A protein has these predicted regions:
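DPxDG-like acidic metal-binding loop motif
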Residues: 78-102
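Solvent-exposed alpha-helices and their adjacent loops that cap or buttress functional pockets
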Residues: 1, 9-12, 58-59, 116-118, ...
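Alpha/beta catalytic cores of group-transfer enzymes, especially the acyltransferase/condensing modules
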Residues: 102-147
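ATP-binding N-lobe of GHMP and related small-molecule kinases
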Residues: 1-74, 255, 268-273, 278
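Beta-strand segments within the central parallel beta-sheet cores of soluble alpha/beta enzyme folds
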Residues: 63-67, 101-111, 201
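Short beta-strand scaffold segments in enzyme catalytic cores
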Residues: 16-20, 122-126, 131-133, 240-242, ...
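C-terminal nucleotide
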Residues: 144-278
C-alpha cells in the first residue's frame, strides 16, 4: 500500500456512480456491467471483488451484481478505472455491512488499481477530491496530499480525442524515466506556489517534457496558446483540458470547436471526494 505516485490533479463532478446488488446464500457469481451492458473484462473491478473475497468469508457464496455508470470517457486520462474501483469498494463495504472505514475501503481500491497497472495515485486523489498535490506516495491513509482551494466559479473544460493506455505507459521505461526526471522538480515548484495558475503552467510544461502529445492535442494546444488560454494534456489521455471561469467559457468553446475531431466536456470540480449516495 506504500506504492503510489507523487503528482497533482483535479477531480471532476462528471464522475462514476456504482450500484451493487448482493444476494446472500447463493452460488458465488460476479456480474459487471458498464452503462447497462454486461462486460467480461473490467479487470480492476474484478480485482476489488477478489480482494474482498480473500478478506471476508461473508462475501463468499454471494451473487454480486455491479453496475458502473461512468460519466467521463474511458481511457482518456479521467481516472475512470480508479473511480470504478473506489466507488465499488465503498459500495461493497456498505452493501455487505463489512464494517470497514471509508479509508480502509479506499485502500482496497488503491491496491486493486496498482496490481492491475492502471494507476498509482488516482484513488487517493479521488478519495479526497478537489485540486490536490500528492506529496507522499501511497494508498489513502498512507500517502499524503495538500489541497489547493478552488473557487466555485471555476470549471474544467476538456476536449477529448480518444484513449491512451495507462498500463502501457506506466510499464514503458523511457516514459517512466521522463516522468521521474522532471516530476519531482515540478512538484517542488507547485508546492512553493500552490495556485491554479501555477498548476496549469507546470502541468503543460510536464506534458511537453514527457513527450506523449499527439497531433490532435498539439494542434489544439497551439490554438489555445494563440488565444492566450493555458491548456494542458492529462496523463494519460488524448485530450486537452483547462481550468477556466465559467463566465468565460464561450472563449474556450470557440477554440475547441475549431477542432473538427473529438468532443467537448465541461465539468465543475468535485470538492468532497467519493461519497456514498442515498
Amino acid at each position: 500500500m506504500r506504492v503510489g505516485s507523487k503528482g497533482a490533479g483535479v477531480s471532476l463532478n462528471l464522475g462514476t456512480k456504482t450500484i451493487v446488488r448482493v444476494k446472500r446464500g447463493s452460488k458465488q457469481r460476479l456480474r459487471i456491467g458498464i452503462g447497462n451492458q454486461r462486460v467480461s473484462s473490467a479487470s480492476v473491478s474484478r480485482e476489488v471483488v477478489k480482494i474482498f473475497l480473500q478478506r471476508f468469508h461473508s462475501v463468499r457464496n454471494c451473487d454480486v451484481e455491479v453496475e458502473h455508470e461512468i460519466g467521463a470517457p474511458i481511457g482518456a486520462g479521467f481516472g475512470t478505472s480508479g473511480a470504478a474501483a473506489l466507488s465499488l469498494a465503498l459500495a461493497l463495504n456498505e452493501a455487505m455491512d463489512l464494517g470497514m472505514s471509508r479509508i480502509e475501503a479506499a485502500q482496497v481500491a488503491h491496491v486493486a488499481e496498482v496490481r492491475c497497472g492502471t494507476g498509482l495515485g488516482t484513488v487517493i486523489a479521488e478519495t479526497y477530491g478537489g485540486l490536490e498535490i500528492r506529496v507522499k506516495p501511497g494508498a489513502p491513509g498512507i500517502g499524503e496530499l495538500v489541497c489547493v482551494p478552488v473557487p466555485k466559479n471555476l470549471v474544467v473544460a476538456c476536449h477529448v480525442f480518444g484513449p491512451l493506455s495507462t498500463r502501457k505507459f506506466l510499464s514503458d521505461p523511457l516514459t517512466r524515466s521522463r516522468i521521474n526526471n522532471l516530476g519531482g522538480k515540478m512538484l517542488k515548484l507547485l508546492i512553493e506556489a500552490p495556485t491554479i495558475a501555477n498548476f496549469m503552467k507546470l502541468s503543460r510544461r510536464f506534458a511537453e517534457h514527457v513527450g506523449l502529445i499527439t497531433a490532435n492535442v498539439r494542434a489544439l494546444l497551439d490554438r489555445a496558446d494563440k488565444a492566450a488560454i493555458v491548456c494542458s494534456m492529462p496523463m494519460f489521455g488524448d485530450c486537452v483540458f483547462a481550468m477556466i471561469d465559467k463566465n468565460s467559457i464561450d472563449e474556450i468553446l470557440r477554440v475547441f470547436q475549431e477542432q473538427q475531431a473529438g468532443r467537448t466536456i465541461i465539468s465543475s470540480v468535485n470538492q468532497e471526494g467519493a461519497q456514498l449516495l442515498n
